[in-house]
Amino acid sequence: MIYRTLAGEKVSQLGFGAMRLPQIGGQIDEKESIRMIHHAIDSGINYVDTAWVYHNGTSEDLVAKAFKGGYREKSFIATKSPVWLIQKDEDFEYYLDKQLENLQVDCIDFYLLHALNSGTWATCKKHNAIDFCEKMVKKGKIKHFGFSFHDAHPVFIDIVDAYNWEFCQIQYNYLDRKEQAGLDGLNYARSKNIDIIIMEPLRGGNLVEPLPETVKELWKSAGKQRSAVEWALGWIFSHKDIGVVLSGMSTMEQLVENLAIAGSNGPDCFTSEELALIDKTEELYRQNTRIGCTQCAYCMPCPSGVDIPRNFKVWNELYMFGKSETARGAWQWIDAPVRADKCTRCGVCVSHCPQQIAIPDELEMMVKDFAG
């Protein structure tokens, strides 16, 4: 494992994201999830990331169970404040205390104001979030604090300029260099000596499968053959100015592959030719992808029962595969009660989407696309 610095701490460059844990029947597969976290820590990962909302509020409890037997002492723990639930100043400590209880710890190493955007940042300012975090550091309930971000670049700059932050967490991958905070935001934060955590390095798995045929052909021309995961993660690891790269792994096979990549790809690991190849890859994806959904599921649950991430995933695959009959047939594999055509345009989902997608409009377009 290669290690980097985050808020003065020595951290593994690959972090374990407890957002997409293995499941059975819609619930966390506890045994397999714990086995994976133990293997991750035994293999050198020392940063485990969770949040109040992950897995419908059960991720923190699972991490607590995984940290028994000495594993807590071997790893940093990160979780996040559910800012969207805050209605008064005191709510911040109420939720923090609940999270300390969930995680069965006295102190959280890295605490983030979760998924900041213009609305939740206004909540933070109204209810004195920064003052709260500073007080919690003094109380010993948290060690370091920062924020995670999902909004437009100007909002990111406003938040960065508001405080002397230790670190921030941004979405970044070779398709998102100009999205949200983007590369310019990353560089701006570093100019302020703010350390960087990367999320969505595989764009919710969309950079792994299904691969457009044009991308497969392009990669065959590379001098060194890499898997889709290594192209995506390796490109991130080649950056010097980052700390932890989070990956939400759902299987032991994914974990083993990511560990191997993290152990052999560090700063400047890509040649200039490989970097140029990634630039071309981005161009090809931009030509094929229909919508920028990362499958984060922040839009869920839908009041009308629509499985929004699954619908958008099928829609993107339709375009990646050139609207083939096989891709078009995937629509039939979505259960009728959760298909896009059940959307009532209530709009509840829109404010929760980190990608700022006009979800009802896009679902309507999707229905027309598959009908055509």
Language-model regions: role of each:
Residues I24, W84-M199, P210-K216, G223-K224, ...:
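Glycine/proline-rich, positively charged
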